[in-house]
């Protein structure tokens, strides 16, 4: 089960996606379905079948987004978070071999398509919560334990640790 929290930026992105699907993409596909239906026999009409399927997928996503936007709690940055890892933080960590990782801890709905975002529900994020720069973090993974050290913690929209 995923945690029902989201960053302000993530919430805005979901609202933007919903708006685009409902105002732009769905009307476009609805027109294509109507055009394909006007051609006659729908049973062998690939355009009709494809666009009808696409319309169902759009409607499914719209329902999901509407429900999700009602259910999630937006967690905004607070100055009290400075110096420790909390939700929304950009974190850089390093291990004993000198390997580094940089990422932001966000909600479940925000991680897709982003290599630099991890879910608050991930083992790494859970291990990092409330840690400070210089702290050692032991992460329990399916392959065993991994030890990392917190190199830097930053907050802010669009902030990266690059």
From Swiss-Prot:
<keyword id="KW-0238">DNA-binding</keyword>
<comment type="function">
    <text>Necessary for efficient RNA polymerase transcription elongation past template-encoded arresting sites. The arresting sites in DNA have the property of trapping a certain fraction of elongating RNA polymerases that pass through, resulting in locked ternary complexes. Cleavage of the nascent transcript by cleavage factors such as GreA or GreB allows the resumption of elongation from the new 3'terminus. GreB releases sequences of up to 9 nucleotides in length.</text>
</comment>
<dbReference type="GO" id="GO:0006354">
    <property type="term" value="P:DNA-templated transcription elongation"/>
</dbReference>
<dbReference type="InterPro" id="IPR023459">
    <property type="entry name" value="Tscrpt_elong_fac_GreA/B_fam"/>
</dbReference>
<dbReference type="GO" id="GO:0032784">
    <property type="term" value="P:regulation of DNA-templated transcription elongation"/>
</dbReference>
<dbReference type="InterPro" id="IPR036953">
    <property type="entry name" value="GreA/GreB_C_sf"/>
</dbReference>
<dbReference type="InterPro" id="IPR018151">
    <property type="entry name" value="TF_GreA/GreB_CS"/>
</dbReference>
<feature type="coiled-coil region">
    <location>
        <begin position="52"/>
        <end position="73"/>
    </location>
</feature>
<comment type="similarity">
    <text>Belongs to the GreA/GreB family. GreB subfamily.</text>
</comment>
<keyword id="KW-0175">Coiled coil</keyword>
<keyword id="KW-0804">Transcription</keyword>
<dbReference type="InterPro" id="IPR006358">
    <property type="entry name" value="Tscrpt_elong_fac_GreB"/>
</dbReference>
<dbReference type="InterPro" id="IPR036805">
    <property type="entry name" value="Tscrpt_elong_fac_GreA/B_N_sf"/>
</dbReference>
<protein>
    <recommendedName>
        <fullName>Transcription elongation factor GreB</fullName>
    </recommendedName>
</protein>
<keyword id="KW-0805">Transcription regulation</keyword>
<dbReference type="InterPro" id="IPR001437">
    <property type="entry name" value="Tscrpt_elong_fac_GreA/B_C"/>
</dbReference>
<dbReference type="Pfam" id="PF03449">
    <property type="entry name" value="GreA_GreB_N"/>
</dbReference>
<dbReference type="GO" id="GO:0003677">
    <property type="term" value="F:DNA binding"/>
</dbReference>
<dbReference type="InterPro" id="IPR022691">
    <property type="entry name" value="Tscrpt_elong_fac_GreA/B_N"/>
</dbReference>
<dbReference type="Pfam" id="PF01272">
    <property type="entry name" value="GreA_GreB"/>
</dbReference>
<dbReference type="InterPro" id="IPR028624">
    <property type="entry name" value="Tscrpt_elong_fac_GreA/B"/>
</dbReference>
<dbReference type="GO" id="GO:0070063">
    <property type="term" value="F:RNA polymerase binding"/>
</dbReference>
